[in-house]
């Protein structure tokens, strides 16, 4: 699907009509309201929740149409396996690197040193729910959950990996049938237009959702709660910033594009993630923009939904950094062997808890429960600020998946470099999400 807007028309668009400006203003208004009128702010949570539900409602159709039509158009079905294999290699490499970065930074900065907190004085009940959910997760259970019990159930539940699983199988079956399936493929391609137009309509509510979510966050937790653990928050934000601009920036430069240009290209989606703390809210927009930036639909459809479960750079940085913070704060010594064990467990548990609400915190609980040296009760120290850290996790995860999509597309020879340069340089009308704010009149 292509939604075109000429550069000339876009140049005349008033600033206030751009989605990123509206969302940014809404975030600022939400912070002010939540700070000065916290009681009112906490009552606005339904606005953020309703918007996220609206977007989640459309995620399954977007993934299905993108993946099924993309694979159906492939003449070489072996390419599906190659794309998936290359994506998983990339995900494993950079997820591990993110875990190592968090571990190294925690050892160098030591954000929890000097706190001298007795684990026995902490309220373990506060994190009991997360620990219980963590014990329910396993690698086997996670893999089995990818296969839905019914065809309709995957779409009804909105499980991304289940929908992706069905979409891949259906796309392969369409490709095998060949010409006889062309009417079905044509129908699905035609259905793509109204589905993405619906996404455009839903995105008009993004400022309202961001306003409600931010007002609730500040109203409930307060800006003052940040000051108590400012060292940990600052370390995590700075580490994530450096990971994006140095590590991912180097990957981008090696593959022929600029990380700054990419961030500028997806700024509307990033602000949406910031306002809602949910990367899922921007998934349809990211898939659309990556396709318009020159990545083939088949690659976009496979890499992005899979990356939402397996390519969580921000979450991985958070896990090892937070685990060592708890150890330092509670004066729990960790040998190099303990830290290597922590790293290995985190590599597995980060996959077992993928796709779960509050996955970052639950994954941390799962990791600590297997590494006996670090007290799980220590998670109570960061429970109050986790909401503020989740925004940075989501943003880092989001940028990581955008970079991964372009890189895998280039590896597979499914990237139009000229179209990518035009999109990131703003020289061509390849953006789809601006249509969210300014539909053709």
From Swiss-Prot:
Residue intervals annotated with topology Cytoplasmic: 1-30, 88-99, 169-171, 229-241, 301-320, 370-378, 425-441
Superkingdom: Bacteria
HAMAP family referenced in this protein's UniProt entry, alphabetically: C4_dicarb_transport
PANTHER family: AEROBIC C4-DICARBOXYLATE TRANSPORT PROTEIN (PTHR42865:SF1), PROTON/GLUTAMATE-ASPARTATE SYMPORTER (PTHR42865)
Family that this chain belongs to: Belongs to the dicarboxylate/amino acid:cation symporter (DAACS) (TC 2.A.23) family.
Induction description: By succinate, fumarate, and malate.
Residue spans crossing the bilayer: 31-49, 69-87, 100-118, 150-168, 172-190, 210-228, 242-260, 282-300, 321-339, 351-369, 379-398, 406-424
Pfam families recorded: SDF
Location of the protein in the cell: Cell inner membrane
Cellular-component GO terms for this entry: plasma membrane
GO molecular function, one term: fumarate transmembrane transporter activity
InterPro entries per UniProt: C4_dicarb_transport, Na-dicarboxylate_symporter, Na-dicarboxylate_symporter_CS, Na:dicarbo_symporter_sf
Broad class of the protein's primary localization: membrane
Name of encoding gene: dctA
NCBIfam families: PRK01663.1 (NF002461), PRK13027.1 (NF009587)
Keywords: Cell inner membrane, Cell membrane, Membrane, Plasmid, Symport, Transmembrane, Transmembrane helix, Transport
Protein name (record): C4-dicarboxylate transport protein
Membrane disposition: Multi-pass membrane protein
Periplasmic-side positions: 50-68, 119-149, 191-209, 261-281, 340-350, 399-405
Gene Ontology biological-process annotations: L-aspartate transmembrane transport
Biological role stated in the UniProt entry: Responsible for the transport of dicarboxylates such as succinate, fumarate, and malate from the periplasm across the inner membrane. This transport system plays an important role in the energy supply of rhizobium-legume symbionts.
